[in-house]
């Protein structure tokens, strides 16, 4: 087994909720991360926008709080998801979420 684990904090810019045909609750958020990191002894501005998918009953207690402007920390794994336009994009499937605001 190989490692696929990511922890990222940021601000929710969009969110939506739905249930799958099997009745599983899903929340989908767009997470915006801004920070500064050192790379090769130089300070670098870091900016990321990435979709995060939260699935199943363990997230139902926080789903009402996942709204634009809320700061969160997400821990999960990354995978490719194919959009309706056929383009692949990287997304995070959350295993844990912590509200920061």
Swiss-Prot record:
Residues 1-101 form the SSB domain. One of its GO terms (molecular function) is single-stranded DNA binding. One of its GO terms (biological process) is DNA replication, synthesis of primer. GO terms for cellular component: primosome complex. It comes from the Bacteria. PROSITE patterns: SSB. SUPFAM superfamilies: Nucleic acid-binding proteins. Pfam families: SSB_1. Homodimer. Interacts with PriA and DnaT. Component of the replication restart primosome. Primosome assembly occurs via a 'hand-off' mechanism. PriA binds to replication forks, subsequently PriB then DnaT bind; DnaT then displaces ssDNA to generate the helicase loading substrate. Belongs to the PriB family. Involved in the restart of stalled replication forks, which reloads the replicative helicase on sites other than the origin of replication; the PriA-PriB pathway is the major replication restart pathway. During primosome assembly it facilitates complex formation between PriA and DnaT on DNA; stabilizes PriA on DNA. Stimulates the DNA unwinding activity of PriA helicase. This is Replication restart protein PriB. It comes from Shewanella oneidensis (strain ATCC 700550 / JCM 31522 / CIP 106686 / LMG 19005 / NCIMB 14063 / MR-1). The gene is priB.
């Amino acid at each position: 087994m190989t490692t696929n684990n990511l922890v990222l904090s940021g601000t929710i810019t969009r969110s939506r909720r739905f249930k799958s045909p099997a009745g599983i609750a899903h929340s989908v958020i767009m997470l915006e991360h801004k920070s500064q990191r050192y790379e090769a002894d130089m300070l670098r501005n870091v900016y990321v926008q990435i979709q995060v998918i939260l699935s199943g009953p363990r997230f139902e207690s926080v789903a009402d709080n996942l709204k634009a402007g809320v700061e969160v920390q997400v821990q999960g794994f990354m995978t490719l998801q194919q959009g309706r336009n056929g383009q692949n994009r990287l997304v995070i499937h959350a295993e844990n979420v912590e509200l920061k605001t």
